[in-house]
């Protein structure tokens, strides 16, 4: 009788032990591969512009003790006509609360840059601000979810002081530079 109980116990352990081992291996693979992390994207809310080829880079400078956040992005014009970029902003503010950098010359980022249809420009060192206009401070390996906001004119606009605004949703991991 005792042999049968031992055999039943061994069969139980062998059957369910393999199942438990398989579950542990699947959980370990999920933790290692992290499929739940959002991909790095840059997606404009309206057609005519792209910025995900290559994905934007968000970084902090090693020499910057405060950990101020900066962005590099490549802006492609597919709007069908030449545009002139006036101002650029990186922010984590909700869409309706985007700070207006045009009112503060200290936050002016990009001079007038012409982009013809099908061409691109690289925006480098774009500082990131929160909804109050304060610099965003972060650290390496954090995930950034925010917006790239661009004020621009079409080359043939009647009044260049009236600017168009486009916003791109950006998700990226923060790296360290320098």
What is each residue range found by the language model?
Residues 18-31:
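Hydrophobic membrane-insertion alpha-helices, especially the h-region
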Residues 31-178:
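N-terminal export/assembly leader peptides and their processing motifs that target proteins to secretory
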